[in-house]
Amino acid sequence: MFTNNLTKNALVTLVSGFMAIFIGFNTVQPAEAYPIFAQQNFKNPREANGRIVCANCHLAQKPVELEVPQAVLPDTVFEATVKVPYDKSIKQVGANGKPAELNVGAVLILPEGFQLAPSDRIPEEMKTKVGNLYFSPYSTEQKNILVVGPVPGKDYSEMVFPILSPDPAKDKSVSYLNYPVYLGGNRGRGQVYPDGSKSNNNVFGSPVAGTVSEIKALKSKKGGYEVTITTASGNTVVEKIPGGPEVIVSEGEVVTVDQPLTNNPNVGGFGQGEAELVLQNPARIQGLLLFLLATIGAQVFLVLKKKQFEKVQLAEMNF
């Protein structure tokens, strides 16, 4: 989610700046720090109906993928792989109205008790896969919800989250069960700001019915247009269009209410996914192994006894 007035909030600027420095990516515009706005406006990123709140600002739907192990043991580090695919050749409309590379971000909602693995617990091989990504908890009370981004999509359309599983022997609130894991992933900027206003990565429509009487190109650095519409009663309404979208109507054209005046510049989108993993009890695995060994042993014993019985029968027949 994005906004143009991020600099008004010192805390948000500090957090966004730290994230950008940490990942070595210093070209992220403040308007692209979308995870911050979900954290600011929603206590929980997943609503009761299962919808992740990032969809409030990122209106287009795009696919995402989530891969987790089928089962994990307690107090172990494992990988959760997030994929946010998109065509790397395309560019989006930046906040300044100019073409820009797409960034990606994600929110991973883990079961309670699961959390980001400490650095000293992450194997070197996994650290290589993680790269320079910086993950942060959604809040101090929700360490099981992790956010990342915005980061360059050309480098991180696939992200590896290092996760530490809980130990029910130490945390009595956790049980050996089958758990859901939820993902929200995005590529590109949003179409709506948290206050409900449109970004320049959106379609702009006619506020009234009438005739387009003038289309004026603005001379500001960010570009844009002023489209004047004259209604049937003779009133004029001016629709200001920021730099980025292209005007698709012409002077003298009759338009209706909400008819698009511009193209849709958005090339990104948001998607949700989910997976399941089992927090496996080691004692169950040990019990299963013992059962299998006992079963195999019994089968071998029966085969040997059968062969021994056949030998005795054969000897009696020969006698």
From Swiss-Prot:
Gene Ontology molecular-function annotations: electron transfer activity; heme binding; iron ion binding
Domain of life from the UniProt record: Eukaryota
Cofactor(s) this protein cannot do without: heme
Gene Ontology biological process terms from the UniProt entry: photosynthesis
Subcellular location(s) per record: Plastid, Chloroplast thylakoid membrane
Membrane topology note: Single-pass membrane protein
Cofactor remark from the record: Binds 1 heme group covalently.
Keywords on record: Chloroplast, Electron transport, Heme, Iron, Membrane, Metal-binding, Photosynthesis, Plastid, Signal, Thylakoid, Transmembrane, Transmembrane helix, Transport
Binding site for heme: 34, 54, 57-58
One GO term describing the cellular component: chloroplast thylakoid membrane
Signal peptide positions on this chain: 1-33
InterPro entries for this protein: Cyt-f_TM (IPR024058), Cyt_f (IPR002325), Cyt_f_lg_dom (IPR024094), Cyt_f_lg_dom_sf (IPR036826), Rudment_hybrid_motif (IPR011054)
Family note: Belongs to the cytochrome f family.
Function, as annotated: Component of the cytochrome b6-f complex, which mediates electron transfer between photosystem II (PSII) and photosystem I (PSI), cyclic electron flow around PSI, and state transitions.
PANTHER family found in the cross-reference section: CYTOCHROME F, PTHR33288
Subunit and partners: The 4 large subunits of the cytochrome b6-f complex are cytochrome b6, subunit IV (17 kDa polypeptide, petD), cytochrome f and the Rieske protein, while the 4 small subunits are PetG, PetL, PetM and PetN. The complex functions as a dimer.
Name assigned to this protein: Cytochrome f
